[in-house]
Protein backbone atom coordinates (compact mmCIF):
# COMPACT_ATOMS: atom_id res chain seq x y z
CA UNK A 1 0.00 0.00 0.00
CA UNK A 2 1.40 3.40 -0.98
CA UNK A 3 1.66 6.35 1.36
CA UNK A 4 -1.16 7.98 -0.60
CA UNK A 5 -3.35 4.90 -0.12
CA UNK A 6 -2.54 4.84 3.58
CA UNK A 7 -3.39 8.52 3.82
CA UNK A 8 -6.71 8.01 2.02
CA UNK A 9 -7.57 5.04 4.25
CA UNK A 10 -6.77 7.04 7.37
CA UNK A 11 -8.91 9.92 6.15
CA UNK A 12 -11.82 7.58 5.41
CA UNK A 13 -11.52 5.98 8.86
CA UNK A 14 -11.49 9.40 10.46
CA UNK A 15 -14.60 10.42 8.52
CA UNK A 16 -16.43 7.22 9.51
CA UNK A 17 -15.56 7.69 13.18
CA UNK A 18 -16.62 11.32 13.09
CA UNK A 19 -19.86 10.42 11.33
CA UNK A 20 -20.62 7.64 13.82
CA UNK A 21 -19.90 10.00 16.72
CA UNK A 22 -22.16 12.67 15.26
CA UNK A 23 -24.99 10.19 14.79
CA UNK A 24 -24.57 8.93 18.36
CA UNK A 25 -24.70 12.47 19.69
CA UNK A 26 -27.82 13.27 17.67
CA UNK A 27 -29.60 10.10 18.77
CA UNK A 28 -28.58 10.72 22.37
CA UNK A 29 -29.92 14.25 22.18
CA UNK A 30 -33.23 13.03 20.81
CA UNK A 31 -33.56 10.34 23.48
CA UNK A 32 -32.56 12.56 26.39
CA UNK A 33 -34.12 15.79 25.19
CA UNK A 34 -37.41 14.62 23.75
CA UNK A 35 -37.74 11.04 24.85
CA UNK A 36 -40.16 11.71 27.67
CA UNK A 37 -41.11 14.12 30.36
CA UNK A 38 -37.86 13.42 32.13
CA UNK A 39 -35.40 15.46 34.10
CA UNK A 40 -32.30 15.03 36.23
CA UNK A 41 -33.93 16.12 39.45
CA UNK A 42 -32.76 14.43 42.64
CA UNK A 43 -31.76 11.21 40.90
CA UNK A 44 -29.46 10.50 43.83
CA UNK A 45 -31.92 11.54 46.53
CA UNK A 46 -33.15 8.66 48.69
CA UNK A 47 -36.48 7.04 47.92
CA UNK A 48 -38.29 7.84 51.12
CA UNK A 49 -40.23 5.18 52.99
CA UNK A 50 -43.95 5.93 52.85
CA UNK A 51 -43.98 6.83 56.54
CA UNK A 52 -41.30 9.50 55.98
CA UNK A 53 -42.88 11.27 53.02
CA UNK A 54 -44.66 14.57 53.70
CA UNK A 55 -48.42 14.23 53.97
CA UNK A 56 -51.44 16.49 53.78
CA UNK A 57 -53.56 13.84 55.56
CA UNK A 58 -55.54 13.16 52.40
CA UNK A 59 -57.19 9.75 52.58
CA UNK A 60 -58.25 7.57 49.68
CA UNK A 61 -61.87 8.55 50.28
CA UNK A 62 -61.17 12.29 50.19
CA UNK A 63 -61.66 14.60 47.26
CA UNK A 64 -58.72 16.93 46.96
CA UNK A 65 -58.00 19.72 44.50
CA UNK A 66 -54.81 21.66 43.97
CA UNK A 67 -55.29 25.07 42.39
CA UNK A 68 -52.31 26.68 40.72
CA UNK A 69 -52.81 30.39 40.15
CA UNK A 70 -50.40 31.40 37.40
CA UNK A 71 -49.68 34.64 35.59
CA UNK A 72 -51.59 33.12 32.64
CA UNK A 73 -54.65 32.06 34.62
CA UNK A 74 -55.92 29.49 37.09
CA UNK A 75 -55.34 25.77 36.62
CA UNK A 76 -57.31 23.39 38.84
CA UNK A 77 -56.24 19.77 39.28
CA UNK A 78 -58.49 17.07 40.70
CA UNK A 79 -56.12 14.67 42.43
CA UNK A 80 -56.35 10.87 42.51
CA UNK A 81 -55.65 9.90 46.14
CA UNK A 82 -57.16 6.42 45.74
CA UNK A 83 -54.71 5.62 42.92
CA UNK A 84 -51.62 7.62 43.87
CA UNK A 85 -51.90 8.35 47.61
CA UNK A 86 -48.20 8.91 48.30
CA UNK A 87 -47.76 11.26 45.37
CA UNK A 88 -50.94 13.23 46.04
CA UNK A 89 -50.11 13.69 49.71
CA UNK A 90 -46.50 14.67 49.05
CA UNK A 91 -47.41 17.28 46.42
CA UNK A 92 -50.32 18.64 48.45
CA UNK A 93 -48.04 18.96 51.49
CA UNK A 94 -45.47 20.83 49.39
CA UNK A 95 -48.22 23.09 48.06
CA UNK A 96 -49.45 23.82 51.59
CA UNK A 97 -45.91 24.97 52.43
CA UNK A 98 -45.91 27.33 49.40
CA UNK A 99 -43.15 25.25 47.79
CA UNK A 100 -44.44 25.93 44.27
CA UNK A 101 -45.13 29.64 44.73
CA UNK A 102 -43.13 31.93 42.44
CA UNK A 103 -41.70 29.04 40.44
CA UNK A 104 -41.78 28.80 36.65
CA UNK A 105 -42.95 26.11 34.28
CA UNK A 106 -39.58 25.56 32.67
CA UNK A 107 -40.22 23.11 29.82
CA UNK A 108 -42.63 22.78 26.91
CA UNK A 109 -42.63 19.99 24.32
CA UNK A 110 -44.53 20.35 21.06
CA UNK A 111 -43.72 17.38 18.81
CA UNK A 112 -44.85 13.84 19.59
CA UNK A 113 -44.98 14.62 23.30
CA UNK A 114 -47.29 17.44 24.33
CA UNK A 115 -46.58 18.58 27.87
CA UNK A 116 -45.85 21.63 29.99
CA UNK A 117 -43.48 20.77 32.84
CA UNK A 118 -43.49 22.60 36.17
CA UNK A 119 -42.60 22.11 39.82
CA UNK A 120 -38.86 22.79 39.86
CA UNK A 121 -37.97 25.55 42.34
CA UNK A 122 -34.70 26.17 40.48
CA UNK A 123 -36.39 26.49 37.07
CA UNK A 124 -33.65 24.39 35.49
CA UNK A 125 -35.12 20.89 35.38
CA UNK A 126 -32.63 19.69 38.02
CA UNK A 127 -34.32 20.80 41.24
CA UNK A 128 -36.38 18.83 43.69
CA UNK A 129 -37.52 18.54 47.31
CA UNK A 130 -34.74 16.24 48.52
CA UNK A 131 -36.76 13.04 48.54
CA UNK A 132 -38.03 10.59 45.95
CA UNK A 133 -41.55 9.17 45.76
CA UNK A 134 -42.19 5.56 44.72
CA UNK A 135 -43.94 5.12 41.39
CA UNK A 136 -47.73 4.76 41.53
CA UNK A 137 -50.63 4.45 39.11
CA UNK A 138 -48.54 3.80 36.02
CA UNK A 139 -50.64 3.51 32.83
CA UNK A 140 -50.79 0.65 30.37
CA UNK A 141 -48.29 0.77 27.47
CA UNK A 142 -50.93 1.71 24.91
CA UNK A 143 -51.45 4.53 22.45
CA UNK A 144 -52.40 7.87 24.02
CA UNK A 145 -51.88 6.49 27.52
CA UNK A 146 -51.43 10.07 28.72
CA UNK A 147 -54.56 11.79 27.33
CA UNK A 148 -55.08 15.55 27.31
CA UNK A 149 -55.75 16.82 30.82
CA UNK A 150 -53.54 14.23 32.51
CA UNK A 151 -51.21 15.41 35.28
CA UNK A 152 -48.22 13.13 35.91
CA UNK A 153 -44.83 13.14 37.60
CA UNK A 154 -41.61 13.83 35.76
CA UNK A 155 -38.68 11.69 36.79
CA UNK A 156 -35.10 10.69 36.08
CA UNK A 157 -35.81 6.96 36.18
CA UNK A 158 -37.84 4.48 38.22
CA UNK A 159 -38.66 5.66 41.72
CA UNK A 160 -37.20 9.16 41.32
CA UNK A 161 -40.30 11.36 41.28
CA UNK A 162 -39.81 14.46 43.42
CA UNK A 163 -41.72 17.69 42.86
CA UNK A 164 -41.64 18.13 39.08
CA UNK A 165 -44.81 17.29 37.22
CA UNK A 166 -46.19 17.76 33.73
CA UNK A 167 -49.53 18.89 32.33
CA UNK A 168 -50.60 17.06 29.17
CA UNK A 169 -52.35 19.45 26.78
CA UNK A 170 -52.83 17.03 23.86
CA UNK A 171 -53.16 13.23 23.77
CA UNK A 172 -49.66 11.80 24.20
CA UNK A 173 -48.07 8.36 24.05
CA UNK A 174 -45.21 7.74 26.47
CA UNK A 175 -43.62 4.77 28.15
CA UNK A 176 -45.64 3.65 31.19
CA UNK A 177 -43.09 5.24 33.49
CA UNK A 178 -44.70 8.36 34.95
CA UNK A 179 -47.06 8.40 37.93
CA UNK A 180 -50.48 9.80 37.01
CA UNK A 181 -51.81 11.69 40.01
CA UNK A 182 -54.45 14.09 38.73
CA UNK A 183 -56.64 15.51 36.00
CA UNK A 184 -57.00 19.12 34.90
CA UNK A 185 -60.64 20.05 35.53
CA UNK A 186 -60.26 23.75 34.75
CA UNK A 187 -57.61 25.63 32.81
CA UNK A 188 -56.64 23.11 30.14
CA UNK A 189 -57.32 25.77 27.53
CA UNK A 190 -54.76 27.99 29.28
CA UNK A 191 -52.08 25.33 28.86
CA UNK A 192 -53.10 24.83 25.23
CA UNK A 193 -52.79 28.56 24.57
CA UNK A 194 -49.33 28.57 26.14
CA UNK A 195 -48.38 25.61 23.96
CA UNK A 196 -49.66 27.29 20.80
CA UNK A 197 -47.04 30.03 21.25
CA UNK A 198 -44.31 27.40 21.07
CA UNK A 199 -40.84 27.18 22.54
CA UNK A 200 -38.78 30.30 23.16
CA UNK A 201 -36.08 29.40 20.61
CA UNK A 202 -38.43 27.80 18.10
CA UNK A 203 -37.54 24.14 18.66
CA UNK A 204 -39.78 21.29 19.81
CA UNK A 205 -38.48 21.18 23.39
CA UNK A 206 -37.42 23.99 25.68
CA UNK A 207 -38.62 26.93 27.72
CA UNK A 208 -42.10 28.10 26.66
CA UNK A 209 -42.17 31.32 24.66
CA UNK A 210 -45.02 32.47 26.89
CA UNK A 211 -43.51 32.64 30.35
CA UNK A 212 -45.50 30.79 33.01
CA UNK A 213 -45.07 31.51 36.71
CA UNK A 214 -47.00 29.76 39.46
CA UNK A 215 -47.88 32.69 41.70
CA UNK A 216 -49.73 30.80 44.43
CA UNK A 217 -51.24 27.42 45.24
CA UNK A 218 -54.26 26.28 47.21
CA UNK A 219 -55.20 22.81 48.42
CA UNK A 220 -58.89 22.04 48.96
CA UNK A 221 -59.81 18.82 50.75
CA UNK A 222 -63.36 17.54 51.23
Residue ranges of each PLM-predicted region?
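Cyclophilin-like peptidyl-prolyl cis-trans isomerases
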Residues: 1-222
Amino acid sequence: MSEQDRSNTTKKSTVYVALFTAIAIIVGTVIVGIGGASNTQDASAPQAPAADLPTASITESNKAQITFTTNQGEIIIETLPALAPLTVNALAALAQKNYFDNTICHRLTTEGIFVLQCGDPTGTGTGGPGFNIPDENLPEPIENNYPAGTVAMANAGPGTSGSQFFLVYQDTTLGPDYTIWGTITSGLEIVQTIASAGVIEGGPDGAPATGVTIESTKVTIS
